[in-house]
């Protein structure tokens, strides 16, 4: 019996002589029960399965007890997982050492628990890859690249500059002098990189996944992770080439390239094929789910065989899964609860168990510079992330602080890197302990700071201009049109026909109209909301829903008639009423739309008479006006195209211009329509009878500039008219609006005119539809005799 075994109470574990001789880890799996040996019932823990069960029970007891207290102060469960591992570590219960002695003569006696822990990491990393917003990963703009490059390289260079500082003070008993720079390089490298699965987990935990801020964070993490991946591969290749064998180094890098190619050109198309073959609204066959999970596990095993970071395989497979239903959502629904609540906590606790606080305190003098280096890299990385956000990306200060804080967040993949470095002896046990405690504090403090700074009501705020007024020359006009009922289809298409101009497609100063049609269906009989894309491949598997078929046929016909100037993509969203505005905003963010067009909710009969108001649609519109990441247009349609042929009828479009950003946006939209030969555009500017000093008001100056530009553009056009009307007081405004409406088929007006000289307060008190603004409410009134449709425009709400 060894010294370590002599310290363990109870009988010796049931090893054979051969096992003792070779120090092997072969052991019996299941026992005969607790009564196998009545005098010493603990003998059952000499078997793998009962011991594993005891280990898991102890882990969850510690997690639950820790979280009972920590959750009261808002600390995430991830911290409780680490804390449970520290409680069960050498400084207190020393579970791993005890378990090792029960099964074998060396540490690998915990192979069963280690296996469960690694499986948990693989599964959780895979799910994070599945849940990652693929558009944020694959459609990366300049801002995330700048932030990621700055934070990665500035941190890496600054940290490595101090790598050899005070090496002469390192105690050879703590670590050989030649290994000390390697340990510091590990610290700097892991600090420099921001890992995509970790940030995905954080963004989902903070419920930021649908916000633009969350998308910036994920895109930035994707770039940083890619840079870290390349760095890791290069370092691994050079190290293996120099210190092991050139042949093995070449073999490992070729194996990695083969896996990436297989995932890109075989697995990813197969996953897309599964999605295409699954009928819309139907679940994916279970066999595909299990095959997908096994593929992720196999990819991880494959990489571990070739000396690569094993969880990378699971991440690559997860990123290859198409977003949302049916496959991605099914994987989340089936495996997320098991992995998140069972496997993942075990994985974190097992890695934390290897930390030895007592040893770290004993070696404090030797690791003190490592602690200083860790603090330095934290400050440098935060600064290197904050400055580009604020200066180059022009994000508001609060959002810049949030992004910089997110970039410093550390999580489960970082723990995995530390664990691998410890096993490869690139980290000492004392430094490993410091890094575990650092992640513990990091994961407890940073999310709390982010929660305090992040306002969920601002989740869809656009940090770049997404409106029609600021579109660049030759840019496509991206419009998201929303439909709640079949009655909304004709109005939406009639409006879009005015924006497209197939007869004047030789205009080189404008792009095409990129239309995204979203059919919103109130959720009934479904547990989870679902977004279904429609494309050519989905025609054979359409939902048996006549409304959706009608929508698709109508928009398909519209695209065929305007194929030179228009593209159309269609979606159906099954959603709860209170989440419809979020579905609209999410799709608008994904497609970078300039304007969302929604129906007003007021229904008119075929002969133009008022029928009813839909309260649900009005509530959705009110929320959308507050949340939208781009401009919004609310269409009150009364059938201006009735009795008119599409090819030769003239549509009289009027714009009432009072002033302000909403009116300027309405004018920009009308300018697009003016290029259609079927449109006769009239701009009516309302002026106050009072004399004003316009030179002191910036908005007045901008209004004049926009109007002058419009008049110059259409100075020679036969289909453009401009007039000015002087109105004094609310009654005069109402009368003039009603008279103007009689001469037009469609009126386009801005929503907000609060800062302007026209006295509209009296009219505001009598509004029936506040979401349309004062002028829009007048034009949508039940009492208005003129059969005119109205589009009320609100420009993108930007916040500094």
From Swiss-Prot:
Gene Ontology process terms (BP): potassium ion transport; proton transmembrane transport
Membrane topology: Multi-pass membrane protein
Similarity comment text for this entry: Belongs to the monovalent cation:proton antiporter 2 (CPA2) transporter (TC 2.A.37) family. CHX (TC 2.A.37.4) subfamily.
The protein's role, per its UniProt record: May operate as a cation/H(+) antiporter.
Main location: membrane
UniProt protein name: Cation/H(+) antiporter 9
Keyword check for Glycosyltransferase: no
């Amino acid at each position: 019996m060894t010294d370590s075994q002599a310290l363990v109470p109870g009988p010796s574990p049931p090893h054979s002589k051969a096992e003792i001789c070779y120090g092997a880890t072969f052991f019996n799996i299941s026992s005969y029960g607790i009564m196998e040996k009545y005098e010493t019932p603990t003998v059952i823990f000499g078997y793998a399965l009962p011991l594993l069960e005891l280990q898991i029970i102890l882990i969850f007891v510690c997690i639950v007890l820790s979280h009972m207290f920590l959750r009261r102060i808002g600390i995430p469960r991830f911290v409780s997982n680490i804390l449970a591992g520290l409680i069960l570590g050498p400084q207190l219960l020393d579970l791993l050492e005890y378990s090792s002695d029960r099964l074998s003569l060396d540490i690998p006696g915990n192979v069963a628990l280690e296996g469960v822990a690694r499986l948990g990491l693989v599964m959780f990393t895979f799910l994070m890859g599945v849940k990652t917003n693929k558009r944020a990963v694959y459609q990366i703009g300049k801002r995330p690249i700048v932030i990621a490059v700055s934070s990665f390289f500035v941190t890496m260079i600054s940290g490595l500059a101090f790598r050899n500082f005070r090496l002469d003070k390192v105690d050879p008993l703590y670590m050989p002098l030649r290994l000390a720079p390697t340990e510091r390089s590990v610290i700097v490298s892991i600090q420099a990189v921001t890992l995509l699965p970790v940030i995905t987990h954080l963004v989902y935990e903070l419920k930021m996944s649908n916000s633009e801020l969350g998308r910036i964070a994920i895109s930035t993490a994707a770039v940083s992770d890619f840079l870290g991946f390349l760095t890791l591969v290069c370092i691994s290749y050079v190290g293996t080439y120099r210190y092991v064998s050139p042949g093995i180094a070449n073999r490992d890098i070729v194996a990695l390239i083969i896996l990436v190619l297989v995932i890109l050109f075989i697995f990813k198309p197969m996953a897309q094929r599964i999605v295409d073959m699954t009928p819309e609204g139907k679940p994916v066959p279970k066999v595909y789910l299990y095959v997908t999970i096994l593929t992720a596990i196999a990819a991880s095993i494959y990489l571990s065989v070739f000396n690569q970071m094993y969880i990378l395989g699971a991440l690559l497979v997860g990123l290859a899964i198409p977003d949302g239903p049916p496959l991605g959502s099914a994987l989340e629904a089936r495996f997320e609860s098991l992995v998140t609540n069972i496997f993942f906590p075990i994985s974190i606790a097992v890695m934390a168990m290897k930390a030895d606080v007592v040893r770290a305190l004993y070696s404090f003098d030797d690791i003190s510079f490592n602690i200083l280096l860790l603090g330095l890299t934290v400050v440098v990385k935060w600064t290197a992330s904050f400055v580009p956000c604020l200066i180059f990306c022009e994000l508001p200060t609060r959002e810049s602080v949030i992004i910089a804080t997110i970039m410093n967040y550390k999580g489960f993949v970082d723990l995995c890197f530390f664990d691998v470095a410890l096993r490869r002896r690139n980290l000492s046990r004392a430094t490993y302990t410091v890094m575990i405690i650092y992640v513990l504090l990091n994961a407890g403090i940073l999310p709390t700071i982010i929660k305090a700074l992040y306002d969920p009501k601002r989740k869809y705020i656009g940090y770049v201009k997404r409106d029609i007024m600021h579109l660049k020359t030759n840019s496509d006009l991206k419009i998201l049109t929303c439909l709640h009922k079949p009655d909304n289809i004709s109005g939406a298409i009639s409006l879009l026909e005015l924006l497209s101009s197939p007869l004047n497609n030789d205009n080189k100063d404008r792009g095409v109209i990129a239309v995204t049609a979203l059919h919103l269906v109130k959720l009934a009989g479904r547990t989870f909301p679902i977004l279904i894309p429609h494309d050519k491949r989905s025609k054979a598997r359409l939902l048996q829903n006549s409304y959706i078929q009608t929508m698709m046929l109508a928009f398909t016909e519209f695209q065929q008639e305007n194929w030179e100037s228009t593209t159309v993509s269609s979606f159906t969203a099954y959603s709860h009423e209170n989440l419809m505005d979020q579905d609209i905003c999410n799709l608008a963010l994904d497609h970078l739309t300039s304007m969302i067009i929604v129906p007003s909710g007021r229904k008119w009969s075929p002969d133009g008479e008022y029928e009813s108001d839909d309260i649900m649609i009005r509530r959705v519109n009110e929320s959308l006006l507050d949340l939208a990441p781009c401009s919004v247009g609310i269409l009150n349609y009364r059938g201006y195209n009735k009795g008119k042929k599409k090819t030769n009828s003239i549509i009289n479009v009027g714009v009432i211009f009072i002033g302000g950003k909403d009116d300027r946006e309405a004018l920009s939209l009308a300018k697009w329509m003016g290029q259609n030969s079927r449109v006769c555009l009239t701009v009516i500017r309302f002026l106050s009878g009072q004399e004003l000093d316009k030179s002191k008001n910036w908005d007045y100056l901008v209004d004049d500039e926009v109007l002058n530009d419009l008049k110059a553009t259409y100075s020679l056009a036969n289909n453009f008219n401009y007039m000015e009307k002087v109105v004094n007081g609310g009654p005069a405004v109402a009368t003039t609006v009603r008279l103007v409406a009689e001469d037009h088929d469609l009126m386009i007006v801005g929503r907000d005119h609060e800062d302007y000289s026209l006295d509209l307060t009296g009219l505001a008190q009598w509004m029936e539809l506040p979401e349309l603004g004062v002028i829009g409410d007048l034009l949508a009134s039940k009492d208005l005799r003129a059969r005119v449709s109205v589009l009320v425009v609100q420009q993108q709400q930007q916040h500094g």
